[in-house]
From Swiss-Prot:
One of its GO terms (biological process) is ribosome disassembly. GTP binds at residues 14-21, 78-82, 132-135. It is found in: Cytoplasm. SUPFAM superfamilies: EF-G C-terminal domain-like (SSF54980), P-loop containing nucleoside triphosphate hydrolases (SSF52540), Ribosomal protein S5 domain 2-like (SSF54211), Translation proteins (SSF50447). This is Elongation factor G 2. Keywords: Cytoplasm, Elongation factor, GTP-binding, Nucleotide-binding, Protein biosynthesis. Residues 5-280 form the tr-type G domain. Belongs to the TRAFAC class translation factor GTPase superfamily. Classic translation factor GTPase family. EF-G/EF-2 subfamily. InterPro entries: EFG_II, EFG_III, EFG_III/V, EFG_IV, EFG_V, EFG_V-like, EFTu-like_2, P-loop_NTPase.
Length: 694
């Protein structure tokens, strides 16, 4: 049985193009998993195995890879850097124990770096930092570490220092051991020598060595006291303190190098072994009760406890349906029967595999700490708990963001409907942030996602991977509706048509709810005017209407309803009568309560060369942007701004034109806000026209 203390489940996180996939490739090369490193530059990387990833030079799916370094098992997940695929990062963090944050030596802390860092902090994931691409023009290790402090609010613990700059970057100095690692010009990772610190760096190395020791020993009161008395701690004692501080997120061991040029990578692997936690050293996952609340128990990581695992990713590849799981406790053998706690159904495990990106190794068994894929499971979705049927439990589920953009698609020929339906079913299972519905009036299939690139990739997969020839509509914004004032109202549903009739009268207050509260209901009825048995029917009636607003038919957000009185008939009143009354009350009262149209606001991060700042800001103002921040960088200016999603379609083309191709941007959903009257009127009119045309 494998020693859990020698397991490292880690993710690699970064902004687009910071070099995380190349970093993963070099890790695989050094650990002997591949013999020739691939590159995103030429579309040959091992973890970017989708056609869309190879062509665009970005990571879209989280690819799991297993490898070994110094008797330690690494399960590595290379995650996407583009904000449209943040859900992949989120669900990876859910099952990881540690991570490597990769930052570009010239780009520094970029927008998606902040998002990933925030998610990792929320998940309590310990990390080491790798400042990559120090061979690039404009790379500056210390500028990046300063940004880590200023922008991320994190404390970088500098473990290596660069030898040389830009094209003269030849190696690194290990600050703890005060040894220099110098690579030759062959570009091979193993072609390095360990030397004395260069003469012109001795003072600098000594300064950072002292700072490293001082910061580390603060994690151990006894060691700190002896250090203050002049006793120099051993390297092993310092490493133990660094490990504790890293696990507690007190600081982040920070390394430098060039993944592409194979410089500095061995020290990163050593850092994963020395400082990132094993599965038994992280806070255990909470267990949930039937209502979805924490029950006070935890999924302790141990091979001696009953089997518990979380399905964190579903993927359909050329080998068949794969369910990626993180095993938290117990053991799993081929042929075992396991319970899906969500569905209540059991399944037999036919085949288990260990993933090597696009390849696989068959497994006879797996244990706590492992990240594996089970082949051919049915009715399992992302976030489902798999467990021992004799010991049913539920792990904390995953919560995914709501899509903000949609497009209509339909096959060019009728024969493509079935093919498209099967393909979309598989894609929805793989990506919980990708949703699909059918327009009841037009019969069109509506694809919903997190951004233009997200849906662009999905359409591309439908066309090329599944061979569905599509007609694709224009992107549509996911508007919402809400109310702005509190009213008190009454509604009676009465129907008599021979025999027993229907009767339900409700008196209620309806008012704006808390932001992001959705729908809330309470009853303050005193006495028996509305019997308690009918209260759930009233709630159900109101809630069922939240999906279709009165202004333009968009879903309604944040409404609170209080039932305070009413009336009933001993014979004619029923649950269905009160449900119908609540539906009528909703239609009657929402217009009176100041119905308002809401639009999604995006948090936009724009980078532009300095000489184009005026044009870019002017354009953002015309797009109804609200400026949040503006900060100068080494090669340009970074602008943070909130902009309505409706104003951002096609923005990349405009930005490239304004900046001669040098501008970049990313955006993610921020919040919903009221539409200006002129915008609301146009949207409502367009929706009415669309419905009339159907």
């Amino acid at each position: 049985m494998a020693d859990l203390s020698k397991y490292r489940n880690i993710g690699i996180f970064a902004h687009v193009d910071a070099g995380k996939t190349t970093t993963t490739e070099r890790i695989l090369k050094l650990t002997g998993q591949i013999h020739k490193s691939g590159d995103t530059h030429d579309g040959t990387s091992v973890t970017d195995f989708m056609d869309q990833e190879s062509e665009r030079g970005i990571t879209i799916q989280s690819a799991a890879v297993s490898c070994f370094w110094k008797d330690h098992r690494f399960n590595v997940i290379d995650t996407p850097g583009h904000v449209d695929f943040t859900v992949e990062v989120y669900r990876s963090l859910k099952v990881l124990d540690g991570g490597i944050g990769v930052f570009c030596g010239s780009g520094g802390v970029e927008p998606q770096s902040e998002t990933n860092w925030r998610y990792a902090n929320e998940s309590g994931v310990a990390r080491v930092i790798f400042v990559n691409k120090l061979d690039r023009m404009g790379a500056d290790f210390f500028r990046v570490t300063n940004q880590v402090q200023k922008v991320l609010g994190a404390t970088p613990l500098i473990m290596t220092l660069p030898i040389g700059r830009e094209d003269e970057f030849v190696g690194v100095v290990d600050v703890l051991t005060k040894q220099a690692y110098v690579w030759d010009a062959t570009g091979l990772p193993e072609n390095y020598t360990i030397e004395d610190v260069p003469a012109d760096m001795v003072d600098q190395v000594e300064e950072y060595h002292e700072l490293l020791i001082e910061t580390a020993v603060e994690q151990d009161d006894e060691l700190l006291e002896t250090y203050m008395e002049g006793v120099i701690p051993s390297i092993e004692d310092v490493k133990r303190c660094i490990r504790k501080g890293t696990r507690d997120l007190a600081f982040f061991p920070t390394y430098c190098g060039s993944a592409y040029k194979n410089k500095g990578m061995q020290l990163i692997l050593d850092a994963v072994v020395d400082y990132l936690p094993s599965p038994t050293e992280v806070d255990p996952q909470p267990l949930m009760d039937e209502e979805g609340n924490e029950n006070g128990e935890f999924a302790i990581v141990s091979t001696d406890l009953p089997f518990k695992a979380l399905a964190f990713k579903i993927m359909d590849d050329r080998f068949g349906a794969l369910t990626f799981v993180r095993i938290y406790s117990g053991k799993l053998n081929k042929g075992d029967t396991i319970l899906n706690a969500f569905t209540g159904k059991t399944e037999r495990v036919g085949r288990m595999v260990e993933m090597q990106a696009d390849d696989r190794n068959e497994l006879a068994s797996a244990q706590a700490g492992d990240i594996i894929a089970i082949v051919g499971m049915k009715n399992v979705q992302t976030g489902h708990t798999l467990c021992d049927p004799k010991h049913p439990v539920t792990l904390e589920p995953m919560v995914f963001p709501t899509p903000v953009i949609s497009i209509a698609v339909q096959p060019k020929d009728k024969g493509g409907n079935e093919k498209m339906g099967v393909a979309i079913g598989k894609m929805v299972a793989e990506d919980p942030s990708f949703q699909v519905e059918t327009d009841e009036d037009s019969g069109e299939t509506i694809l919903k996602g997190m951004g233009e690139l997200h849906l662009d990739i999905k359409v591309d997969i439908l066309k090329r991977t599944y061979g569905v020839d599509l007609i694709v509509g224009q992107p549509q914004v996911a508007y919402r509706e809400t109310i702005t004032k509190e009213i008190e109202d009454s509604y009676t549903h009465k129907k008599q048509s021979g025999g027993s009739g229907q009767f339900g009268k409700i008196d209620y207050r309806i008012k704006p709810g808390e932001v992001a509260s959705g729908f809330t209901f309470k009853s303050s009825v005193v006495g028996g005017n509305v019997p308690k048995e009918f209260w759930p029917a009233v709630e159900k009636g109101f809630k069922s209407m939240m999906g279709t607003g009165v202004l333009a038919g968009f879903p309604v957000l944040d409404v609170e309803v209080e039932l305070f009185d009413g009336g009933f008939h001993a014979v004619d009143s029923s649950a269905i009568a009160f449900e119908i009354a609540a539906k009528g009350a909703f239609r009657q009262s929402i217009p009176k309560a100041g119905a308002q149209l809401l639009e999604p606001i995006m948090k936009v991060d724009v980078f532009t060369p300095e000489d184009h700042v005026g044009d870019v800001i002017g354009d953002l103002n015309r797009r109804r942007g609200m400026m949040k921040d503006q900060e100068p960088g080494l090669t340009g200016v970074r602008i943070k701004v909130d902009v309505p999603l409706s104003e951002m379609f096609g923005y990349i083309g405009s930005l490239r034109t304004m900046t001669s191709g040098r501008g970049q941007f990313s955006m993610e959903f921020s919040h919903y806000a009221p539409c200006p009257n002129n915008v609301a009127e146009a949207v409502i009119a367009a929706e009415k026209e669309k419905k009339a045309a159907k």
